[in-house]
Design a protein with these regions (language model features):
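Conserved ABC ATPase signature
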Residues: 146-150, 154
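The feature captures the beta-strand-to-loop junction immediately N-terminal to the Walker
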Residues: 45-47
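ABC ATPase nucleotide-binding domains
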Residues: 245-269
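Conserved ABC transporter NBD signature motif
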Residues: 68-76, 85
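Helix-to-loop junction immediately C-terminal to a conserved catalytic motif
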Residues: 60
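Conserved structural motif at the start of ABC-family nucleotide-binding domains
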Residues: 14, 28-31
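Catalytic Walker B motif of ABC-type/P-loop ATPase nucleotide-binding domains
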Residues: 171-175
């Protein structure tokens, strides 16, 4: 269901209820309740190995849940076919180098595949939506460039544009700022906020609590496969919670504009 085509009165795009995730002989997480609404950014936060990637694979329908329910537009995810899921939920992986030297335009056009079939040629509407997505991400001038020859930040914007061209109501981003320099991290986080302002639901994972303070409507903190805290970032990401989660003393300070930031209390060793 695209952002503008949602049934009236439908509040959640995606909701999990007491979700257990992992593998039959290797449980990873248990009892996780998430909810993503239109116009919100939900930040999935936690240290390495806490289960964020496995949870994302489960939400995307790539691996079966081990217990509980996943509801996508109020429908059980397990009852939806892959194409229906892809039309409703777009996935933005970490920036990567493509195996083949596709142009940026062709990379974005791949987002239209779920609407026309794998071997069908893109039509006029597909091309128009791809061009609109390129323009929205501010990378229209890169359309003819080789995707493998642009910067990491530009690749990430191209992947976000591909998700926009997919015309889904929910965008799932797996550590969208990983391996990016500071400037490109800021650029991507700004685009995340713009997507939410346009009415899309966004869920992203990160290791960095400052990203939650910068762009998230709500945060879900995972540790050891279980929910450690959930709610508004300013309310739940306290020094005590962060110190307990990351195992180092953390202070939360405020910038001149009032935005909280995390700082280590002691780097002296």
């Amino acid at each position: 269901v695209a952002a503008g085509d949602r049934p009236e009165g439908l509040v959640s795009i995606l909701r999990t209820e007491r979700l257990d995730f992992g593998y039959p002989r290797f449980p990873v997480g248990r009892g996780v309740d998430l909810e993503i609404r239109p116009g919100e950014v939900l930040c999935l936060l936690g240290p390495n190995g806490c289960g964020k990637t496995t949870l994302f694979k489960t939400i995307l329908g790539l691996i079966p849940r081990q217990g509980g329910r996943i509801l996508l537009d109020a429908e059980d995810l397990a009852r939806l076919d892959r194409r229906t899921i892809a039309r409703r939920m777009a996935y933005v992986p970490q920036a990567h180098a493509a195996v083949f030297p596709y142009s940026v335009r062709d990379m974005v056009l791949m987002g239209r595949t779920v609407h026309r079939g794998l071997f069908s040629s893109p039509g006029q509407d597909d091309r128009a939506r791809a061009e609109a997505a390129l323009a929205q991400m501010g990378i229209a001038t890169l359309a003819e460039r080789d995707y493998t020859r642009i910067s990491g930040g530009q690749r990430q914007l191209a992947l976000i544009a591909r998700a926009l061209a997919q015309d889904a109501g929910l965008v799932v981003m797996d550590e969208p700022t990983a391996s990016l320099d500071f400037g490109n991290q800021v650029l991507v986080l700004k685009e995340v906020r713009r997507l939410a302002a346009a009415g899309l639901g966004v869920v992203l994972s990160t290791h960095n609590p400052d990203h939650a303070f910068a762009c998230a409507s709500r945060v879900h903190l995972l540790a050891d496969g279980a929910t450690r805290a959930a709610g508004v970032p300013r309310e739940v990401l306290t020094p005590e919670v962060l110190t307990r989660t990351y195992g180092v003393p953390v202070a939360v300070e405020q910038l001149a504009n009032g935005q909280p930031v995390c700082v280590p209390e002691d780097l002296s060793g």
